[in-house]
Amino acid sequence: MTHTSENQAGFRVKIQRFGSYLSGMIMPNIGAFIAWGIITALFIPTGWLPNETFAKLVGPMITYLLPLLIGYTGGKMIYDVRGGVVGATATMGVIVGSDIPMFLGAMIMGPLGGYLIKKFDQQIQGKVKQGFEMLVNNFSAGIIGGLLTLAAFKGVGPVVSAISKTLAAGVEKIVDLHLLPLANIFIEPGKVLFLNNAINHGILSPLGIEQAAKTGKSILFLLEPNPGPGLGILLAYWLFGKGMAKQSAPGAIIIHFLGGIHEIYFPYVLMRPILILAAIAGGVSGVLTFTIFDAGLVAVPSPGSIFALLAMTPKGNYLGVLAGVLVATAVSFFVASIFLKSAKNNEEDITKATEKMQQLKGKKSDVVAVLKNEEKVIPAKVKKIVFACDAGMGSSAMGASILRNKMQKAGLNIEVTNTAINQLPEDADIVITHQNLTDRAKEKLPKAFHISVENFLNSPKYDELIEMLKK
């Protein structure tokens, strides 16, 4: 049983790591996607302010700018700027070799370019004669980048283009058959397992952008970012929950619905796993409503705030988008309320559900004594505390802000920052993560002192840590 649980946990970590890598190529470039979405929503013939001149920006941005940014970011993730340059160069091959926006190709060629130039540099390290370093560096990047561009143009581009067209046709078929709402049966559990960024930015967004380029909008942008299912669950906790869960729910509602940080509601589901049915019911009903109203967005909304959704909503789609969010909220609230009111142990709160949650998640519980940290002791001198989450922008930023304020009030002059889990800095003394991500954090930075929390918004571990640092 223990062996099976360890295998399940290891598999989940691998899936999270792969998903984090996919979303890591998209997330840093969200600003560019939003810029393209705004220009599209405003200036295309069916936009709010039709303008033939400005509309000329739409095509080149989606064809060249966005894939090149993804390719550069993918290469940079492997081998810093040098990898990014080769990755972007190689991406140009798939762009020119295809007649559709090549996001999938960019997500392949960018990392491949970074990987190959990294391996080349490792092979020649220490073998280049003094004075020839710059020559070798520049020409090696140019030659490898050029060869990859040619290979991508003639080989990878057409193959990826065919795959992308097949996937797009499959999505259109699913939409035509009105089966798209069933996707949330898989999306909602995946979100709670911290695969939300991978699902949205690694899978749905590339397909949605291709669809939006043809039709001016895509319903795929609404599948994962819809705040309705999470809002309904948090409202149910606020009205029918007990203990810390009830007390923290109002603040979580603001952060989730207005701030767009969906990770805030995941612990509320994980502490009562049956509530995943409420999330699924809300997600399915919301997407069904979007389908009925033929609603869609012009670009990916990030974060998943109601403000971001409305900002990316094209003309004539506001009623459908708002209806989908409201229906999803109402349905998830109704289902969650039934489960919360009928629960036998109503006194269970969010700070006491850790052990049960981890058993259900298929991993050994190590949170009860996390600050004791059986494997390590807290460093004698702490200079930097880093909060880490999957993307490094949402829940970790929220937790870092809370702890930073507590540190200031306690008179402790310690740097508190946040980052993506795959970009943890080597000089971090203490790393704080959600307990479902701690295994990955320990693999990335084994020498640091690791703290697991169940809820970034309201964790007693912050006060315990401050007391330990005062000693």
From Swiss-Prot:
<dbReference type="InterPro" id="IPR036095">
    <property type="entry name" value="PTS_EIIB-like_sf"/>
</dbReference>
<dbReference type="InterPro" id="IPR004718">
    <property type="entry name" value="PTS_IIC_mtl"/>
</dbReference>
<keyword id="KW-0597">Phosphoprotein</keyword>
<dbReference type="GO" id="GO:0022872">
    <property type="term" value="F:protein-N(PI)-phosphohistidine-mannitol phosphotransferase system transmembrane transporter activity"/>
</dbReference>
<feature type="topological domain" description="Cytoplasmic">
    <location>
        <begin position="1"/>
        <end position="29"/>
    </location>
</feature>
<feature type="topological domain" description="Extracellular">
    <location>
        <begin position="299"/>
        <end position="318"/>
    </location>
</feature>
<dbReference type="Pfam" id="PF02302">
    <property type="entry name" value="PTS_IIB"/>
</dbReference>
<dbReference type="InterPro" id="IPR013011">
    <property type="entry name" value="PTS_EIIB_2"/>
</dbReference>
<keyword id="KW-0813">Transport</keyword>
<dbReference type="InterPro" id="IPR029503">
    <property type="entry name" value="PTS_EIIB_mannitol"/>
</dbReference>
<feature type="domain" description="PTS EIIB type-2">
    <location>
        <begin position="383"/>
        <end position="471"/>
    </location>
</feature>
<keyword id="KW-1133">Transmembrane helix</keyword>
<feature type="transmembrane region" description="Helical">
    <location>
        <begin position="30"/>
        <end position="51"/>
    </location>
</feature>
<comment type="function">
    <text>The phosphoenolpyruvate-dependent sugar phosphotransferase system (sugar PTS), a major carbohydrate active transport system, catalyzes the phosphorylation of incoming sugar substrates concomitantly with their translocation across the cell membrane. The enzyme II CmtAB PTS system is involved in D-mannitol transport.</text>
</comment>
<feature type="active site" description="Phosphocysteine intermediate; for EIIB activity">
    <location>
        <position position="389"/>
    </location>
</feature>
<feature type="topological domain" description="Cytoplasmic">
    <location>
        <begin position="77"/>
        <end position="139"/>
    </location>
</feature>
<keyword id="KW-0472">Membrane</keyword>
<feature type="topological domain" description="Extracellular">
    <location>
        <begin position="52"/>
        <end position="55"/>
    </location>
</feature>
<dbReference type="GO" id="GO:0009401">
    <property type="term" value="P:phosphoenolpyruvate-dependent sugar phosphotransferase system"/>
</dbReference>
<feature type="transmembrane region" description="Helical">
    <location>
        <begin position="140"/>
        <end position="161"/>
    </location>
</feature>
<feature type="transmembrane region" description="Helical">
    <location>
        <begin position="56"/>
        <end position="76"/>
    </location>
</feature>
<feature type="transmembrane region" description="Helical">
    <location>
        <begin position="319"/>
        <end position="340"/>
    </location>
</feature>
<keyword id="KW-0808">Transferase</keyword>
<feature type="domain" description="PTS EIIC type-2">
    <location>
        <begin position="18"/>
        <end position="342"/>
    </location>
</feature>
<dbReference type="GO" id="GO:0005886">
    <property type="term" value="C:plasma membrane"/>
</dbReference>
<dbReference type="InterPro" id="IPR003501">
    <property type="entry name" value="PTS_EIIB_2/3"/>
</dbReference>
<keyword id="KW-0762">Sugar transport</keyword>
<dbReference type="InterPro" id="IPR050893">
    <property type="entry name" value="Sugar_PTS"/>
</dbReference>
<keyword id="KW-0418">Kinase</keyword>
<feature type="transmembrane region" description="Helical">
    <location>
        <begin position="279"/>
        <end position="298"/>
    </location>
</feature>
<feature type="modified residue" description="Phosphocysteine; by EIIA">
    <location>
        <position position="389"/>
    </location>
</feature>
<feature type="topological domain" description="Cytoplasmic">
    <location>
        <begin position="341"/>
        <end position="471"/>
    </location>
</feature>
<protein>
    <recommendedName>
        <fullName>PTS system mannitol-specific EIICB component</fullName>
        <ecNumber>2.7.1.197</ecNumber>
    </recommendedName>
</protein>
<dbReference type="InterPro" id="IPR003352">
    <property type="entry name" value="PTS_EIIC"/>
</dbReference>
<dbReference type="InterPro" id="IPR013014">
    <property type="entry name" value="PTS_EIIC_2"/>
</dbReference>
<feature type="topological domain" description="Extracellular">
    <location>
        <begin position="162"/>
        <end position="170"/>
    </location>
</feature>
<dbReference type="Pfam" id="PF02378">
    <property type="entry name" value="PTS_EIIC"/>
</dbReference>
<dbReference type="GO" id="GO:0090563">
    <property type="term" value="F:protein-phosphocysteine-sugar phosphotransferase activity"/>
</dbReference>
<feature type="topological domain" description="Cytoplasmic">
    <location>
        <begin position="192"/>
        <end position="278"/>
    </location>
</feature>
<keyword id="KW-1003">Cell membrane</keyword>
<comment type="subunit">
    <text>Homodimer.</text>
</comment>
<keyword id="KW-0598">Phosphotransferase system</keyword>
